[in-house]
Amino acid sequence: LQPGLEYQYRYSARV
Protein backbone atom coordinates (compact mmCIF):
# COMPACT_ATOMS: atom_id res chain seq x y z
CA LEU A 1 0.00 0.00 0.00
CA GLN A 2 1.02 3.59 -0.51
CA PRO A 3 2.37 5.76 2.33
CA GLY A 4 -0.76 7.92 2.37
CA LEU A 5 -3.10 4.95 2.09
CA GLU A 6 -1.32 2.95 4.75
CA TYR A 7 -1.49 5.89 7.14
CA GLN A 8 -5.23 6.32 6.67
CA TYR A 9 -5.83 2.56 6.74
CA ARG A 10 -3.98 2.09 10.04
CA TYR A 11 -5.54 5.21 11.53
CA SER A 12 -9.03 3.98 10.71
CA ALA A 13 -8.27 0.43 11.84
CA ARG A 14 -7.11 1.73 15.23
CA VAL A 15 -10.66 2.70 16.09
Curated annotation (Swiss-Prot):
Chief site of localization: secreted
Where, per UniProt, does this protein localize? Answer: Secreted, Extracellular space
* Highest rank taxon of the organism: Eukaryota
Question: What's an example Gene Ontology biological process for this entry?
Answer: hemolymph coagulation
**For this protein, what post-translational modification is recorded in UniProt?**
Glycosylated. Contains mannose and N-acetylglucosamine.
Provide a GO CC annotation, any one. extracellular space
Membrane spanning residue stretches: none
The entry's note on the tissues where this protein occurs is: Hemolymph.
Alphabetized UniProt keyword annotations: Disulfide bond, Glycoprotein, Hemolymph clotting, Secreted
What is the recorded function of this protein according to its Swiss-Prot or TrEMBL entry? Forms stable clots in the presence of calcium.
Description of how the protein assembles with itself and partners: Homodimer; disulfide-linked. Also exists as oligomers.
Mind telling me what this protein is named?
A: Hemolymph clottable protein
Which organism is the protein's source?
Answer: Penaeus paulensis (Pink shrimp)
